[in-house]
Swiss-Prot record:
It comes from the Eukaryota. Keywords: Cytoplasm, Leucine-rich repeat, Repeat. It is found in: Cytoplasm. InterPro entries: Leu-rich_rpt (IPR001611), LRR_dom_sf (IPR032675), PRAME_domain (IPR050694). This is Leucine-rich repeat-containing protein 14. Interacts with IKBKB; disrupts IKBKB-IKBKG interaction preventing I-kappa-B-kinase (IKK) core complex formation and leading to a decrease of IKBKB phosphorylation and NF-kappaB activation. Interacts with CHUK.
């Protein structure tokens, strides 16, 4: 939906040279809408000039590219145009160069000086990448190169330079991009472009590089650290964690692929684990924790007891959780605050089922997002859990992919979940009825890799759709797409 003001603005920008000349004559109140229209329609010349002459201290993508009163389209929920993103960066560079040229000849007007360009909140990479759009990796590279280029042109001179511009971004780094990102962070310290990271995701970096990068980040800006290693043991974790823990106001910590054998502990391993726990106790604002590691098996209580405040999001995928881990979590102070819970890859069938049901009851009042991928939940376990599951009245998302459920089990879930008014998304497995020659009980690997009968599954989808229509729940998405952008980020819950 577009208002008359939006359509008029779009018409004004059709001729870019004329629009650029007219910008100084337009009320500054129109600039936010001008920016959104120019970004949406890839009016790159206008975009560059808008950034160059931006009349406000803050230029925020999250504010400007969301749904607004004049346009219902939320661009931040889409992959952003490479042309438009590059135009913004070029406009910022032109602005800095112009201010440098003016600084020695006339006083700098600070009242309407752009101080912050906030490019955070961009859609993260999907499975497929449109070549005409900019991924988070591309954005990181583009911003880093801009900061390096600015440093090579010149640094700020005391008494003459304009106010530096802070670029807030979410950074993604791997082995290929590490060197120039480190250089960008180093060069931005004394530059007119100050690189400020809100969320950091590092993939497959050596420990020394990870530490070096963490040492360059501004603790006042950082909100999330997401470290993804191919293989990090307890010893490596004990090296990394003190550099992470210096960000005491961190809100989200995600540690993936941390390996350790809790069944055969060594003296060094126990010392490293205790050191890790001590460092975790330093965080005073942590609200989200994600750790995928079997080292927590049987001692989840030790980790959760060290934290200074209750968590609102807890992801414990493939942690080999034991019944006592689930019981402790249910009785802990965290349970009453959890909005997001991910227990994927933990067997919730045998002895774990009853403690899991107790945990569901404990989190029912607050839970919005529940992920149970590959948890060995068959029809019997699902039916036994439904009375507790449906008490989660605020639940919006339920992930059950990779579980050995039949069509009959899915239909029971659909019928019983009608009372969950907030439920919007159910990611369900391909029913076992759609496989041929399936061993029982089927391992998760078989469910994920075996071929299904497409004709049978088409009938299943049609029947589920009819049931949703009949129950007045057509707005609820039932899907087998685990690679879509359906799982909400904690900060967007």
């Amino acid at each position: 939906m577009h208002t008359l003001v939006f359509l008029s603005t779009r018409q004004v920008l059709q001729c870019q040279p004329a629009a650029c000349q007219a910008l100084p004559l337009l009320p500054r109140e129109l600039f936010p809408l001008l920016f959104k229209v120019a970004f949406m329609d890839k009016k790159t010349a206008v975009l560059r000039e808008l950034v160059h002459t931006w009349p406000f201290p803050l230029l925020s993508f999250q504010q400007l590219l969301q749904e607004c009163a004049h346009c219902s389209r939320a661009l931040l929920q889409e992959r952003l145009s490479t042309e438009s993103m590059q135009a913004v960066i070029l406009g910022l560079t032109a602005r800095i160069h112009a201010r440098e040229a003016e600084a020695g000849t006339q006083p700098v007007c600070r009242k309407h000086t752009l101080r912050v360009l906030d490019m955070t909140g961009l859609l993260d990479d999907g499975v497929e990448q449109d070549p005409g759009t900019m991924s988070m990796w591309d954005c990181t590279a583009a911003v880093a190169r801009t900061c390096i280029a600015q440093q090579q042109v010149g640094t700020a001179k005391p008494g003459l330079s304009p106010v530096p511009v802070e670029i807030r971004v979410d950074l993604r780094v791997n082995r290929a991009s590490y060197t120039f990102l480190r250089e960008a962070l180093q060069s931005s310290v004394d530059s007119l472009l100050r690189l400020c990271c809100r969320d950091l995701r590092a993939e497959d970096l050596p420990m020394r590089n990870t530490v070096a990068l963490l040492q360059l980040l501004d603790a006042g800006c950082l909100r999330r650290i997401d470290l993804r290693f191919n293989n990090l043991g307890l010893r490596g974790l004990s090296v990394i964690i003190p550099h992470v823990a210096r960000f005491q106001h961190l809100a989200s910590l995600r540690l993936h692929y941390v390996h350790g054998d809790s069944r055969q502990p060594s003296v060094d391993g126990e010392d490293n684990f205790r050191y890790f726990l001590a460092q975790m106790g330093r965080f005073i604002c942590l609200r989200e924790l994600s750790i995928g590691s079997s080292l927590l098996s049987g001692r989840l209580d030790q980790l959760l007891s060290t934290l200074q405040r209750p968590l609102e999001s807890l992801e414990l995928a493939f942690c080999a959780l034991l019944p006592e881990d689930l019981r402790f979590l249910a009785q802990s102070s965290h349970a009453a605050h959890l909005k997001k819970l991910d227990l994927s890859g933990n067997d919730l069938s045998g002895n774990q089922l009853t403690p899991f049901q107790g945990l569901l009851q404990a989190v029912a009042a607050t839970l919005l997002h529940l992920e149970l991928t590959e948890c060995q939940i068959a029809d019997a376990q699902l039916l036994a859990t439904l009375p507790t599951l449906t008490r989660c009245a605020s639940l919006r998302y339920l992930g059950l992919y990779g579980n050995p459920l039949s069509m009959a089990g899915l239909k029971e879930l659909l019928r019983d979940s009608v009372i969950q008014a907030e439920l919007r998304t159910v990611v369900h497995p391909f029913p076992v009825d759609c496989y041929e020659g399936l061993p029982w009980p089927p391992p998760a690997s078989v469910l994920l890799e075996a071929s299904i009968n497409e004709e049978k599954f088409a009938r299943v989808e049609a029947e589920l759709h009819q049931l949703l229509l009949a129950s007045g729940r057509a707005h609820v998405l039932w899907t087998t797409d685990i690679y879509g952008r359906l799982a909400a980020d904690y900060f967007n819950l």
